[in-house]
Amino acid sequence: MMVNIAGSKESDLPKGIATAEDMINFFNSSMANMAAHDKGTQLRFGVVINSLIYTDGVQLYHCTAGKDRTGWVTAVIQLLVGMKYDDVLQDYLLTNAYTADRVNATYQYMVSTQGEAAANIYRPVLDVREEFFKAQFDEVIKVYGSIDKYATEGLGLSDEDIEKLKEQMLVGYKSKSAS
């Protein structure tokens, strides 16, 4: 199964952003809103997690760059199965090592099509950053109180779904209901 979590249309780059700091602030706000308040995106995240639980075989989920929405839903999965926040954050930040060539190519393309000044404004959001992850996580906790409540109330998963996810992802895990 393949799930596109990019949304119904490609996002336009925001207009009127004057500095890289403006872009970072805009991005933090956008990512936090997407994770905690955008019901359409939350629905797609729930579909991704349910497909991992209930569909046999290879699973592929993606977004536009494979780092923001994909990174967030992957982090949620890791947190739901019991990984520690700091370990999930470090895994998320590894994205930069694996995408450095693509990010550089994207930046160079932006320089050639929009000019260096504009490319420099957008450059910070081509990577992943701790502050991007933290903005999403903090807003989700503020709204839902915990990742488990986010999963059930925001993403539409049941407690049984979360137990089955753990069974799928963790070697030797026995669900509470199997005890």
Predicted regions, residues:
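Ser/Thr-glycine-rich phosphate-binding loops at phosphate-binding pockets of nucleotides
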Residues: 65, 69-70
